[in-house]
Curated annotation (Swiss-Prot):
This is Ribosomal RNA small subunit methyltransferase H. It catalyses: cytidine(1402) in 16S rRNA + S-adenosyl-L-methionine = N(4)-methylcytidine(1402) in 16S rRNA + S-adenosyl-L-homocysteine + H(+). NCBIfam families: 16S rRNA (cytosine(1402)-N(4))-methyltransferase RsmH. The keyword Thylakoid does not apply. It comes from the Bacteria. InterPro entries: RsmH (IPR002903), SAM-dep_MeTrfase_MraW_recog (IPR023397), SAM-dependent_MTases_sf (IPR029063). Residues 333-342 have a biased composition (Polar residues). It comes from Xanthomonas campestris pv. campestris (strain ATCC 33913 / DSM 3586 / NCPPB 528 / LMG 568 / P 25). It is an enzyme of class 2 (transferase). GO terms for molecular function: rRNA (cytosine-N4-)-methyltransferase activity. Coiled coil: none annotated. GO terms for cellular component: cytoplasm. Its main location: cytoplasm.
């Protein structure tokens, strides 16, 4: 299997294409185009009758897509979140869908996007810079409790309250407008430790997830993807942290496995699976990590939508599964051992 251009190295490239099982005349959707590494691989396997739809809410990614694939009649380009993919494709019409979650390497590498604590730039963090509130805008008006809740819920930051109090105190003296300002402030209030991870890592992740509604979009996108897939179609999702992966894993399991039965409850309708798990968690091997260290935290999961005949053969007793809920800052979490987290 050919490799993508060296200029951009998409994570788990070969595993994604194998998981999607791209066919010559199939219809595929890349819900997170980025710089098009996976999309190029799909196109290499499509014939003249194949079709590729690409989506991204980042205007820079859309510009790359139009420049790279604008002349290819097989490609349709749409700006927007994959949460709205149901508005782009009709139900049961797609053979494969890829969602490559989180922030892209180009977004991290450009200081002006405000995602990285390692590169000083405006404190923005929006994947769509034309929509919503920037990180600086939110931090300027959120209460210390709201900030602490976000840091704990989306970053699992044990020092969430301490950091939130420091942010509120500092903004009273001067506005927080730069990534370096925020990173230095967080580092100044964190306990000294031996961790090689930058002290602002969890906080930056949490604020970014909140600003972009990433987990809400993920749940909406998974539901939309299930409806858009044909029977036999494949859903491939790459996640980069435990919150994302938990949602993906639970979503796939909810539609693939009957929930545990309870002898004390009356017998329910038979459970009818909608998905079949193609793989467990797939991670990058050492050879990929040597070329692309950012793949270290990537986890790929693949599931296949079942046709009615396969669904009936997989029927089992069950009581149905309650709809999963992504974590929100309003959720109540246990207090951390140091008593600092909300």
């Amino acid at each position: 299997m050919s490799q993508p251009p060296a200029a951009h190295v998409p994570v788990l490239y070969t595993q994604v294409l194998e998981g999607l099982q791209v066919t010559e005349n199939g219809t595929y959707l890349d819900g997170t185009f980025g710089r098009g590494g996976h999309a190029r691989g799909v196109l290499e396997h499509l014939g003249p009758g194949g079709r590729l739809l690409v989506m991204d809410k980042d205007p820079e990614a859309i510009a790359v897509a139009e420049h790279t694939f604008g002349g290819d009649a097989r490609v349709s380009i749409h700006r927007g979140s994959f949460a709205g993919l149901g508005q782009v494709v009709a139900a049961a019409t797609v053979d494969g869908i890829l969602l490559d979650l989180g922030v892209s390497s180009p977004q991290l590498d450009v200081a002006g996007r405000g995602f990285s604590f390692g590169k000083d730039g405006p404190l923005d963090m929006r994947m769509d810079p034309d929509s919503g509130q920037s990180a600086a805008g939110w931090l300027a008006q959120a209460t210390d409790r709201e900030i602490a809740d976000v840091l704990w819920t989306y970053g699992e930051e044990r020092q969430s309250r301490r950091i939130a109090r420091a942010i509120v105190a500092r903004r009273g003296e001067q506005p927080l407008l730069r990534t370096a300002q925020l990173a230095d402030l967080i580092a100044s209030v964190m306990p000294r430790g031996d961790s090689k991870t930058h002290p602002a890592t969890r906080s930056f992740q949490a604020i970014r997830i909140h600003i972009n509604r990433e987990l809400a979009d993920l749940e909406a996108g998974l539901d939309a993807a299930l409806g858009a897939l044909k029977p036999g179609g494949r859903l491939a999702v790459i996640s980069f942290h435990s919150l994302e992966d938990r949602i993906v894993k639970q979503f796939m399991a909810r539609y693939a496995k009957a929930p545990p039965s309870n002898r004390r409850l009356p017998e329910a309708q038979p459970f009818v699976p909608t998905l079949q798990l193609v793989s467990g968690a797939i991670k990058a091997d050492d050879s990929e990590l040597a070329v692309n260290p950012r793949a270290r935290s990537a986890v790929l999961r693949v599931a296949e939508k079942l046709g009615m005949e396969n669904r009936e053969s997989g029927m089992g007793k069950g009581h149905g599964a309650a709809a999963s809920r992504f974590p929100t800052p309003d959720s109540r979490f246990p207090t951390s051992p140091n008593g600092d987290a909300p």
